[in-house]
Amino acid sequence: MKYDEKAKQKEIYYKEQQERITLYLKYNTKKPNTIKSVHFTSLEQEPMGDAVIEGYINNNKEDEFVAFASSEDNFQFQGDMIESKKVSNLIKYQTKTPDEIKKDLDKKKER
């Protein structure tokens, strides 16, 4: 029973981080709609509890990234990422965190 609950919590957490990473990548591109899809390949938990999430964009496994969610950010992805050169070239120099993006989107909805 406890294992099932822990697995369910991990699945919910993983899904939430996938949404945050996808939002971050798609919102912070230099040109709109250059990232069509985001795929995730693994979620690892480091000994100190930090999450390491790997994936790639646009169905090209060479356009990969590694995203981090650390205890400093309450284990929520905030933009800490290592990208391949191609992914890095698509992303703006000054990016917004997923939380900042959500605030911007909420403001647009209010209008």
Task: Please name every model-derived segment.
Residues 28, 33, 58-60, 74, ...:
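Detector for Asparagine
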Residues 25-33, 41, 65-67, 80, ...:
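Homeobox/homeodomain signature
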Residues 33-40, 55, 73-75, 100-111:
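Generic hydrophobic segment detector
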Residues 62-85:
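A short, surface-exposed beta-strand/turn
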Residues 8, 18-19, 29, 70, ...:
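Short linear sequence elements within intrinsically disordered, low-complexity coil regions
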Residues 82-111:
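C-terminal partner/receptor-binding element of secreted or periplasmic proteins
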